[in-house]
Amino acid sequence: MTEPDSKPKKGRAGRKKAEPVRPPEQFLELAELLDYVGQVIARGVPGGVWVRAEIASLTDRRHLYLDLVQAGEGGAGGVGEVAKCRATVWARERFALEAKFRGATSGATLSAGLKVLLFGTAEFHPQYGFSFNVLDISPEYTLGDAALRLEAMRAELVAEGSYGLNRLLPVPTDFARVAVIAPREAAGLGDFRREADPLEAAGLVEFHYLEATFQGREAGASLLRAVAAARELHQEKALDALFVIRGGGAVTDLAWLNDLELARALATFPAPVVTGLGHARDDTLPDEVACLRTDTPSKAAAYLVRTVVNAAAQAQEAARTIRAEAARVLVEAEAAAAWARDRALSSAVRRVDAAAAEVDALMRQALGLTPQRTLARGYALVRDAAGQPVTRAAGARAGEPLTLEWSDGSVPVRVE
C-alpha cells in the first residue's frame, strides 16, 4: 500500500485556512499624527517670518482669505507653480494692514495678481491643514517689484526698436475719425463722452467705442483684442487717433496696464495713440509709448475738443484770409486792367493822331505835286503833238513839233 502524500493537495479541498493577520499593536490616531506635524512645523518655524509670494485669489468675509503661490518659469495661474498655500488676515490685523498698504500705494487694495512680501506665522491645524497667518505687509516690495518688471519690459521694447515708434508720428491737428478703448460703463468714459458726444452729434467727428477690461488677469488679453479691433478699423478707413482711457484708481491698479504685448501693440499702432489713464504723477508703459499722454479721460476729451475747435478756427481764419486775398487780387487786377485799358487807349489815340498827321502831310505833299501847282512854281510842261507830256529828252525828236505849257499859257516849238 502506498503511503499517503504528506504534501497538501492542490485545489479547494486541499487548501489550508489562512491564519488571521493580527493588526499592529502600536499606531497613531490621525489627530495625533496631525498634532505631531503641527509640533514639527511650530518647532521648525518658530515665531514670525517674512514670506514672498503672489496672491492667486482673495476672498473677503470680514477676515481676508488668500491663496498664495510661488510661480516657476511657467508663471502663475496653475502653470509652473512650485508652491501654494492658504493664508489668512484676521479682522483684528486686517484694517491696520490695509490702511498701511493703501497709504503707501496711493489707495491700492490687496488683489489677485499682486506680488507681496508678508510677515506672519506658520500654523498647522488638524482639521483645516496648513495656513499662514498674516500679521504685516511690506508695500515697498510690491511697488519695487512692479518697477523692476516695468524697467525690464521698457528695455526689451527699446532693444527691439519699437519703444518710440508711435511718438514719431505727427501729433494730430484735427480729428474726423477716432477709436476709443475704455472700460464698459466706467465713470471715465462718461466724462469723455460728455465732451465728445456734441462733436459727433454735429457731424464733426466719427467715434468708434471699443470695450476692454483694464484690471485683473484678463486685462492684458482684453486690451490686446481691443487694439486689434482698432487696427482693423484703421485698415478699413484711416483713423486720426486711438484714445485709451480709464477712470482713476490706485497706483497698483495701473500695474495691470504694464503689459509687454499691449505696449508693443500700442507702440506700433499706425495712428497716433492718446492716453488718459487717470493719474497725473504715475506713468504706465502705454503712457510712455503713446504719441500723447493726458492725465484723465476728461483731459483727453478736452484735448480732442480743443484740437477740433482750433482746427475750425484755423479753417475760418484761412477762409477769411482767402477771401481777403481774393478781394485784394481782384482790386489789383481791376486796377491793372484799368491801367492797361487807359494805356492802350492813349497809345491808340497817339497812333491815330500820328497816322492822321502823316496822312495830312501826304495829302499836302500829293496836292503840292499836281501839274498846276508845279507850273505855278515856275516849271514848264512839255507836250508832244498828241498832247502827252514829254518827260525825257529821248522823247523829243528833231523836227517834231512840241508845246511848252506854263501856268498862264502855252507856246508851240519845234525841235531842231
Swiss-Prot record:
Record field: catalytic activity: Exonucleolytic cleavage in either 5'- to 3'- or 3'- to 5'-direction to yield nucleoside 5'-phosphates
Sequence segments annotated as region (Disordered): 1-21
Keyword vocabulary terms for this entry: Cytoplasm, Exonuclease, Hydrolase, Nuclease
GO cellular component assignments: cytoplasm; exodeoxyribonuclease VII complex
Superkingdom per UniProt: Bacteria
Coarse class of the protein's main subcellular location: cytoplasm
Pfam families assigned: Exonuc_VII_L, tRNA_anti_2
Location of this chain's protein in the cell: Cytoplasm
Enzyme nomenclature, EC number: 3.1.11.6
EC class: hydrolase
GO term, biological process aspect, one: DNA catabolic process
Any GO MF annotation of the entry: nucleic acid binding
Stored HAMAP family: Exonuc_7_L (MF_00378)
Family of this protein: Belongs to the XseA family.
PANTHER family: EXODEOXYRIBONUCLEASE 7 LARGE SUBUNIT
Subunit structure comment from the entry: Heterooligomer composed of large and small subunits.
Stated role: Bidirectionally degrades single-stranded DNA into large acid-insoluble oligonucleotides, which are then degraded further into small acid-soluble oligonucleotides.
Name of the protein this chain belongs to: Exodeoxyribonuclease 7 large subunit
Native organism: Deinococcus radiodurans (strain ATCC 13939 / DSM 20539 / JCM 16871 / CCUG 27074 / LMG 4051 / NBRC 15346 / NCIMB 9279 / VKM B-1422 / R1)
Taxonomic placement: Bacteria, Thermotogati, Deinococcota, Deinococci, Deinococcales
The encoding gene: xseA
